């Protein structure tokens, strides 16, 4: 586990952190290109159409596991990040300055503002707050507060959709977001 220890209120290393995050982003980008994979964040608007959705459900404020935050809601921000949410824009950009400021804020007082995200099939796609997710993933945070809207797919015979419907029952009862179902019938156990 990678942990950085600093005194509260005196951290001002955002530019250095951005340089390190940029290296991680470019490394991920190159690795995905070499494998013939899409090197940027997945975009929810490109993955599904409204015709696939039965309804939307406001989930309110949820503590979302960062491992389950996998993409962005719209195409607008996708080219700013590699697929691992690390930045790929040059250090001389306004984006880099904002990312660096968020990094300093995280180390000095913590990022407290929730992001806005869509949840689809137990994965989260960021509507607002991509840089906050990036900074927290860089610092290996476990979760992030999010105001979540769930996009519920139409019920079908598709195994993953049926599994997801079982997960939603479990989630409604427990409120847990960090559980993945891999086998039908486990929700009742």
Language-model-detected regions and their locations in the chain:
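Short, charged/polar connector segments at secondary-structure boundaries
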Residues: 5-127, 131, 137-138, 183-189
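Glycine- and acidic-residue-rich phosphate-binding/metal-coordinating active-site segment common to enzymes
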Residues: 116, 120-123, 127-188
